[in-house]
Amino acid sequence: MTVLETSYAENANQLGVLRNLRNLIIAVFLTIILGWTFGNQALAKTFELGVEHTEVLPSVSAELRPGAKFNLSAVEAEGQSNVWVKLPEWMCGTWKVGRETAVFRQDFKTGKIDKEPFTYFARHDFQYGMQKDREGGIWHYVGTPYHSKTSLSQFNEIHLVKSKEFRIADEQGVSFTTVMTVIRSNSVSQILETFQQESITSYTPAATPGSIEMTASTKSFDANGKPSRQSNNIATIKQASPFSEVDTYQGKDMKALFCEFLISTDQTNLLPDQAPVP
């Protein structure tokens, strides 16, 4: 091989390396752009309904503030509402969350905004749909207020859900707003931390059967109702099991409550064939 041929070969190799490097850079760039675009498009679905977060929330009461002793029985003294919402069939069943991706984060105290997508594990299950009406429609019980408790290594976390308002529930999507107070207490029920959250959540059918797409925006507030942070997340959620009727939930007779709801809302034509006698 001549000196000229050797030089040409070296240049060709260098050009090949540069082309590969260029293609790699383009691929990475497109991945970032597409991920950012998808995240923002998915998130936009949450706000297409004209639903926006509230600016402030009312302050929490003294008995729910740090230093007080948490008394669940006092919180439960207020009776639950008997409200039901009809859901599309694709939304009903038990769902298993594996991971979520945060596409927007904002700290209201520092003003910092982070739009870098961040995926994290968020394993939990949830169920929608409890009773069927005479025509086969599936309904979900929305009894508020209610609570849930999670025991962690350093504290207990109690979610006191004050309201859950469904805005849309049709074949195109399901959207609702939830307001809750989050309490963290120690082993002797002394409150360590209290904050509030407003979540705007939307579900739509996914392209893959047996999956749904979630977009959620959660805004946190301190005990005085001032905003502290906001996180906007997306996720694809898979169905763990199909819908089946739930006749008993947290010690309550769901079929009886469902029939009471239908009667009180003048929908007796939808009463199940084996409805309990009022």
Residue ranges and their predicted role:
Residues 40-94, 98-134, 240-278:
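Amphipathic/hydrophobic helical signal segments and adjacent flexible N-terminal regions
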Residues 153-234:
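Short helix-loop boundary/capping segments
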Residues 106-173, 186:
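Hydrophobic small-molecule pocket/channel-lining residues, especially in calycin-type beta-barrels
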Residues 32-41:
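C-terminal segment of classical bacterial N-terminal signal peptides
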Residues 5-28:
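Bacterial N-terminal signal peptides that target proteins for export
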Residues 145-161, 225-243, 264-272:
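A short, hydrophobic/aromatic-rich structural module that often spans a beta strand
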